Amino acid sequence: MFYLKGEKEQILLIKHANSGHWSFPKGHVEAGETEIQTAVREIREETGVNALIDTRFREVVTYSPKKDVIKDVVYFFATTEDYETSNQEEEVSDIKWMDMDKVLPSVSYKNDKELVKKAINFYKNHREEFENDYYNNT
């Protein structure tokens, strides 16, 4: 989740209540939902932020939380006009916006750090579109 206004180029991180690691909003697809609908819902539920999803950036992170269990998590590039957050206390113990160039040390897992690098590269490669208010003109 990116907040891109003027000089502010920030990424939203959440601290997961069950594990204490810093990462991104995520969750399970509900019956009848698309991946995009799931992403928008989970971001809103966990952070109180309304997201605009950019489907040009879609990354799948595969990991194994325990033996014989493999999970795929789909991430999209998302932006928001909302800077105020509110955390879903049962799942999220803290939320913070971080400057894009300072976020990597705060991200807990290697896979997530790689995801951040890819998302930042995507943003930099499309910066002019974002600066020209791409989403409000499409």
Please place each PLM-identified region on the residue numbering.
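Short acidic/polar alpha-helix capping motifs at helix-coil junctions
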Residues: 4-7, 25-26, 46-48, 68, ...
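Class I (Rossmann-like) S-adenosyl-L-methionine-dependent methyltransferase catalytic domain
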Residues: 3-5, 60, 64, 70, ...
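N-terminal strand-loop-strand
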Residues: 1-24
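Charged/polar positions on well-ordered alpha helices
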Residues: 1-2, 41, 105, 121
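Unchanged
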Residues: 29-115
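A contiguous, well-structured "functional interface" segment within a domain
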Residues: 1-8, 79, 134-138
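Charged phosphate-binding loop/patch that engages nucleotide di/tri-phosphates or the phosphate backbone
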Residues: 105, 111-138
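Phenylalanine-focused residue identity feature
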Residues: 2, 24, 57, 76-77, ...
